[in-house]
Amino acid sequence: MYDYIKGQLTKITAKYIVVEANGLGYMINVANPYSFTHSVNQLVTIYLHQVIREDAHLLFGFHTEDEKDVFLKLISVSGIGPTTALAIVAVDDNEGLVNAIDNSDIKYLMKFPKIGKKTAQQMVLDLAGKFVEAPQETGHTKARSNKAGNTQLDEAIEALLALGYTATELKKIRAFFEGTSETAEQYIKSALKLLMKG
């Protein structure tokens, strides 16, 4: 098992980043790839969790150990796989997540992609009281980009689709942000907050 990787960030896509270490490029699935935009071609440390399947070895990466801890707690719940856990971590509202679990707020938990009533109830059952202290929000850097606003919005929509949100949900998000100019990272953060409000 890997704990973390330290290397040069060489590539960002809507679903993953690539970190080169010792001549190898590691494809790492992350919650919001564009939150790493400010680190392209720089040395980064990414906290890792490895998932070994019959057909693939997958790496999931996190900015902080707190993010990784939330992810590990989520995948311990029956019905939550790594992709769904990553989508929950992407919302970057760990305090809201912990409060919803501790207060049995099933409706809030059901706003996450692929979380139905049964899984939300299981989250409460398995995780209530497991977070001793609410993890801090990661507050990723608000880096600006020279790319056009629509290109950034397209990248954000692609990343949200990868997290499991539907085209119907994202059509409303696109309409809401049309004409604005933000980085893909900021679009993703703002869109996730809107999606959680319902």
Curated annotation (Swiss-Prot):
Pfam families: HHH_5, RuvA_C, RuvA_N
Residue ranges of the region described as Domain I: 1-63
Location in the cell: Cytoplasm
Gene3D superfamilies documented for this protein: 5' to 3' exonuclease, C-terminal subdomain, DNA helicase RuvA subunit, C-terminal domain, Nucleic acid-binding proteins
GO CC terms of this entry: cytoplasm; Holliday junction helicase complex; Holliday junction resolvase complex
Sorted UniProt keywords: Cytoplasm, DNA damage, DNA recombination, DNA repair, DNA-binding
Main location: cytoplasm
Record region (Flexible linker): 143-147
GO biological process terms, semicolon-separated: DNA recombination; DNA repair
Subunit structure: Homotetramer. Forms an RuvA(8)-RuvB(12)-Holliday junction (HJ) complex. HJ DNA is sandwiched between 2 RuvA tetramers; dsDNA enters through RuvA and exits via RuvB. An RuvB hexamer assembles on each DNA strand where it exits the tetramer. Each RuvB hexamer is contacted by two RuvA subunits (via domain III) on 2 adjacent RuvB subunits; this complex drives branch migration. In the full resolvosome a probable DNA-RuvA(4)-RuvB(12)-RuvC(2) complex forms which resolves the HJ.
The family this protein is said to belong to: Belongs to the RuvA family.
Function, in words: The RuvA-RuvB-RuvC complex processes Holliday junction (HJ) DNA during genetic recombination and DNA repair, while the RuvA-RuvB complex plays an important role in the rescue of blocked DNA replication forks via replication fork reversal (RFR). RuvA specifically binds to HJ cruciform DNA, conferring on it an open structure. The RuvB hexamer acts as an ATP-dependent pump, pulling dsDNA into and through the RuvAB complex. HJ branch migration allows RuvC to scan DNA until it finds its consensus sequence, where it cleaves and resolves the cruciform DNA.
This protein's name: Holliday junction branch migration complex subunit RuvA
Species the sequence originates in: Streptococcus pyogenes serotype M49 (strain NZ131)
Gene name as annotated: ruvA
